[in-house]
Amino acid sequence: PGSTDRYLSSWGVQMAINTSNPAIVKIRQEKLDIMDAEMVNSDAVRIQYASKYARISNYWKYFIGQTKGLKRLDVYDKKVAIENDFRNWINQDADRIGKYGEALPLIENAYKTISKYALANMYYREAGLRGPEILSLAGSFKGLADELAKETPDQEKIGKMKASLKAQSDAYFKDYYEPIDRKTFASMMKMFNEDVACDQKPEFLALMVKKYKGCFKDYADAVFEKSIFT
């Protein structure tokens, strides 16, 4: 039914405090601000986006609170102390060294590798997959696109996919306000471009930055005026 971060190592706690949580909060704050600006001016939009706003806001508040709690309770130092005790216990016995001697170094090295990509991964998830609604809708058509690309597509399968996607699209556009999504797209792409390391950005983003001379509003306008998903 759920998951927990209770058993994170000190390196995991450090990454949450310094990288992952701040990124989630920053990105979601931007999404909420964009929604707020439109919802305050229209009861219809406010009703359309009430559930979406609450969904984004819930985890925004969660990660703000988690970060405050981790700092206030000094969780990082407590984790370090536990790991030091574990390390000392291991080093008291040759058999333990053989069984567990590499445990903490392996975890530490794994986090050293993960931490290099943690910010980019969070932006990919929060500003990409969970960012503009247009991207999630387009992604739901991948299965149909893959089937149609086959040498001999399964027509029965295609028919079922089309029916399912039509129902999904009808529900999607019922609570969709294009100006919010257009502004969100521009903002998310801008944040991704500014905050993620150059060597971890997708090639297409660099091409779009060059094509639209760094104007993400123009980039968003071009996408939304041409896309079949808007």
Residue ranges and their predicted role:
Residues P1-T230:
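Terminal presequence/propeptide segments associated with secretion/organelle targeting
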